[in-house]
Amino acid sequence: MQEASECLEVTRSHPNFTLGNQFKEIMKREADAGNINDRRNHNRRGSSSKNAEIETYLSMHYEFRYNTVLDRTEYRNRSCGHFAKVGRYEINTLRRELDCEESISTSSENLYSIIESSFSPRVNPIQQYFKGLPLIDIGDDSSCGGCNGSIVPSSFSLKAIPDLASCVVVRNSPKWLLYLPKWLVAVVANAMDDRECRNHTCLILTGEQGKFKTTFLDLLCPPALHGYSYTGKIYPQEKDTLTYIGQNLIVNIDDQLKALNKRDENELKNLITCPMVKYRMPYDKYVEEHPHLASFVASVNGNDFLTDPTGSRRFLPFEILSIDINRAKAISMDSVYAEAKALLKSGFCYWFDDDEIAELYRESEDFQVQTAEMELLLRCFEKPTEDENYLLMTITEILTYLGIYTHQPLLAKRMGEALKKAGYIKMSKRRNGGNPIYVYKIRKILPCPLIQTCSSQM
C-alpha cells in the first residue's frame, strides 16, 4: 500500500490530480500479482495431489508387487487372489478407470512411473510361499540325524512325504524312500538361497511308457506355484535354458535324456549345479546375474540313458513298476513341503556324502547305455585269473584285433573307458628297450565269437 500513500501526497500538492484512476491501476497490478502466485501454488499442490490421488485409488482397488523372479510388475484385484502381469493393456484399462470413475486424466508414462517404483514392493513369490507354510514339529534333531546323518524320521513324525513316496513302486524301494525326502528338502533349500545352488541332483523316473512318470513329476510343483514350472525339452546350448533355471521351481525334462549326446549330458550336469545363471530379459539392455532357482526332474521311456561310462552322481534314477496317480493327486503338496521345510530346519542332511556318492556311481550302472566298445570287449575278451596265461595288449592292439572281424568304427577313448569299467589291470611296460607304454592284462576268447557272426552274415 506504499504506492497508495504516495498518491495521497501527490493529491494534496496537486488538487487537480485524479486519484481514482491511479488508485484503481495500482490495486489492479497488486491483484494480478496475487492471482499469479495463487495459480502457481494451486498448480504446485495439484501436481502433487494428482499422483497421490492415483496411488490412493490404485491401493484401494488393487494390490501391486514387483516379482523379483520374473522381473516384472504384477497386480491383482482386492477381491481376486491371482496376480497378473502389468502390461500395456492393463495400463490402458487403469487409465480408463481413473478417467471414468475419478475424473483423473494421466498418461501411460506417468502411470508406469508410479507402478514401477517403490509403490510396488519387491516380492519373491516362491520364497514367500515357503515362508508362509505352517511350522511342523517333527521331533528333536536327533530323530533325523542332525547334520551328521540322513536318516529320515519315522512315519510317526512325518506323514505327507511317506504317503507321497508310497504312491510309487520302484525296483529299488529302500533307496527311493531315502532319496525322495533328500531331493524334496534340497528343493526348499535351493529356493531359499539366492547365492548358491543347493540341489545338485536330478530325480529321474525310468520304465515303460504310460506309467504316469511325467504326470507324477509335474505334481511335485505345488499348485500355488503352478506358474513356476516347465515341462518339455531343454537344449543346454541355448540361452532360453538359462531362463528356465532362473524362473522356475521345477524343470521337468520330458523323455529327452536318451537323445542327449555326451557333450549335452555333460552340459546338463553343469547346469544342474551352477550357482548363478546369466541372461538378459526382453527389452533390457544388460545381461544380469540371477539366482539358480530350478530343481531338475526327468522321465525316460526305458532304462538305458546314461552315456558316460564312468557314471554320474548328478542323477537319481529309479525304475518305475507302478504309480497310483490318483492317490498321489490327492496328497497335499503344501503338507509335503511343510514337512520338507521342517526337515531342513532340523538340520537334515539333504546332500550326499562320499559313501553315498560312491553308491550312486554303482547304482547308475544299470541305467548306462552300453557302447559298442564295451559290448565287443565283453564278447571277445575276458579277465585272466592268477594261474591263467594272458597277453599284454595296448588299446590300439585291441582295436586292431577287433577290426579284423568287424567294420564298426571304434574309438580308443571309449575302449579305455570300457577297460577301466570292466576292471582290467592297467600297467606300464617297456618293449624292446623303448619308452614305457600302457598295456592291459587280457585273454582272448578263442575262437573269436565274431567269426560266427561274420559267417552268418555272408
Predicted regions and their residues:
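P-loop NTPase catalytic core of nucleic-acid-dependent motor ATPases
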Residues: 119-246
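Conserved catalytic/switch belt of AAA+ P-loop NTPases
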Residues: 265-288
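DNA transaction DNA-binding modules
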Residues: 351-458
